[in-house]
Amino acid sequence: MSRNELSGSLGNKVYLPNLNGTNSEKVYFLGCGKKDKEMSEQEYLSLAEKIANAAIESNTKNVHIYLPALAVKGRTEDWNFKILARTLEASCYKYFFKGKKVQSKNILSKVTLLKNVDKKGLTAFNKALKIGHVIGVGMNTSRELANTPANICTPTFLAAQAKKLSRSFPVIKTKVLGEKEMRKIGMDCLLSVGNGSAQESKFIIMQYSGAAKTRKPNIIVGKGITFDTGGISIKPSPAMDEMKYDMTGSASVIGTMRAIAEIKPKSNIIGVIASAENMPSSTATKPGDVVKTLSGQTVEILNTDAEGRLVLCDALTYVERFNPANVIDIATLTGACVIALGHEATGMFSNDQKLADSILESGYASCDRAWQLPLWDSYQDALDSRYADIANIGGRAGAITAACFLSRFTKKYSWAHLDIAGTAYGGKVGKKSSGRPVPLLTEYLLSQK
């Protein structure tokens, strides 16, 4: 302090090795800003990241952190610690591929957060830490799957990971349908996407039962295109490697179910994944083909690169059998959503404003925000087809017309669609998975009492 190295300004960091009076080899001081001054949410998120980075930089397995009481605008102290725990867990995750084995590396073994608190406050404190930590684990589970290269992460691999989660957490029951079972019940639209691939398409159902059977389940449905070449309507080569991330919707379902399995809320939750690989070949679906959906509606496929909605529409029809309280689908569905919202907000559409408001609130609570876009009837005409009930593309306003397509299959229940094309990867996190929207989904599901 005498050398003015420790100013206390937000994010200011000083490292002191072997500090007298402590048993620690390394001590870091981080400035938290002016005392009694309310900080913004963004300032706190930045501080949490700096704390996590300092913990990682220490290159030690065990870290103790003392965080003073900080006033964050519109937030509680429990929220502060929940976000810090989540940030610590998420920041420690590193993905790399070495030799013959996919490996992930979690740097820290133990983190202890220190706080002066009474017995009543301790319960809330521990709950906030647990939820934050578990959501971070769920994010990392999602990131691990999304980052895995497509020659490994196939629909069969995704199904195996879902079953593996069930073995680790028996509270989740997993069922997998192969192509034979899907064809038998009429999921021809989903199957059409994988026609050109040697990889078998899979349909995965993960059920968590934390309440009476009479209670209607909340359902999350993930798009699981493990690699999207565009099919016959093939994509340009630059950045096509990023199309391994076209299964991030399904990764977020597995990550969220992982978090739910640990938190054990008193509700019923079902995670569904519609997975296929979209490849060009002599057996691939062609522009102009007409296929029948599980709902009985027919679809004219004008562009085989608009395939996500084709797997989702059959999944959205399938979940009717569960008599859901509501359904949320999650998909890297349109580049148009990235143009509209960039990499900050997830695009959200809904046929139920109460559900939409709850999702927006959960996005705010989790700092994993969504923004509602219109789902007006006037956009539906863009999907008119000369040869089928509906076309799979609709011209301009691509994120909206894609949501309009899905809305044709959700008339029997409360539904929302999350277009995560801009938030699942890219942007600030670079060419890797962000783990979003696991925080939003988990926050929402925990809010459903």
Question: Could you describe each region identified by the protein language model?
Answer:
Residues 5-6, 142, 159-449:
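A generic structural signal for tightly packed, nonpolar segments enriched in small/aliphatic residues
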Residues 1-224:
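Short amphipathic alpha-helical segment within the helicase RecA-like ATPase core
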